[in-house]
Amino acid sequence: MHVIKFSSEDCGTCHRMSHYDAKVAEELGCTFVSVMLQDTEAYRKYRKILLKQYPNKEGMGWPTYLLVTDPDGDFTIHAELKGGMQQGAFRTKLADLLPS
């Protein structure tokens, strides 16, 4: 499972969560991908995934995490987490979304 984080350079909550989100995702056996909306190359690569979930970007949280299989191919979005949260809550919510 890939955890793709969509965030923005000017989002303070996104920056605070960057201190632990990748580590937590990897500890839970996921591949973590961070996509800053200002990073043109990364955004172009994962844009189709974001727009499938949020066609006009309304309702996104900052940050938004999408749990995806086959992100480079015929991807499937399995779940999402959005908005800021502490490390323990992030770990619990992410673990609850992963298949057993």
Place the predicted regions along the sequence by residue.
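Local sequence-structure signature of Cys/Sec-based thiol-disulfide redox active-site neighborhoods
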Residues: 1-30
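Thiol-based oxidoreductase modules, predominantly thioredoxin-like and allied folds used
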Residues: 6-7, 28-48
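A generic structural signal for solvent-exposed, polar alpha-helical segments
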Residues: 12, 26, 38, 68-71, ...
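Chalcogenol-based redox active-site neighborhoods
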Residues: 12-23, 40-45, 49-60, 86
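Surface-exposed beta-strand edges and their flanking turn/coil or helix-capping segments
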Residues: 18, 29, 47-48, 90-96
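Non-catalytic, surface beta->alpha helical segment in thiol-disulfide oxidoreductase systems
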Residues: 60-100
